[in-house]
């Protein structure tokens, strides 16, 4: 199993319930594909460095998880088509 770090930027118009639902969806995707969530930072609203999809702010969160490469591939596929997600990045941290 490999370690991964994923940063997610969610739409700024989501409420607490929407952010919680998105967190649950991401955690379920990870666990259903053989991975485990090690930690998740709380969602924080921050100003974006530049406009993305006509938005100037977004909710940021970082997920640390372990899984197989197929786990990261499935997350990549699903998050690309998730409307609540503005941008995301999955990386393998330096050992």
Curated annotation (Swiss-Prot):
Transmembrane segments: none annotated. This is Small ribosomal subunit protein bS6. Belongs to the bacterial ribosomal protein bS6 family. SUPFAM superfamilies: Ribosomal protein S6 (SSF54995). InterPro entries: Ribosomal_bS6 (IPR000529), Ribosomal_bS6_sf (IPR035980), Ribosomal_S6_plastid/chlpt (IPR020814), Transl_elong_EF1B/ribsomal_bS6 (IPR014717). Keywords: Ribonucleoprotein, Ribosomal protein, RNA-binding, rRNA-binding. GO terms for molecular function: small ribosomal subunit rRNA binding; structural constituent of ribosome. Coiled coil: none annotated. Binds together with bS18 to 16S ribosomal RNA. PANTHER family: MITOCHONDRIAL 28S RIBOSOMAL PROTEIN S6, SMALL RIBOSOMAL SUBUNIT PROTEIN BS6M. NCBIfam families: S6. It comes from Symbiobacterium thermophilum (strain DSM 24528 / JCM 14929 / IAM 14863 / T). GO terms for biological process: translation. The gene is rpsF. GO terms for cellular component: cytoplasm; ribonucleoprotein complex; ribosome. The keyword RNA-binding applies. It comes from the Bacteria. The keyword Isomerase does not apply.
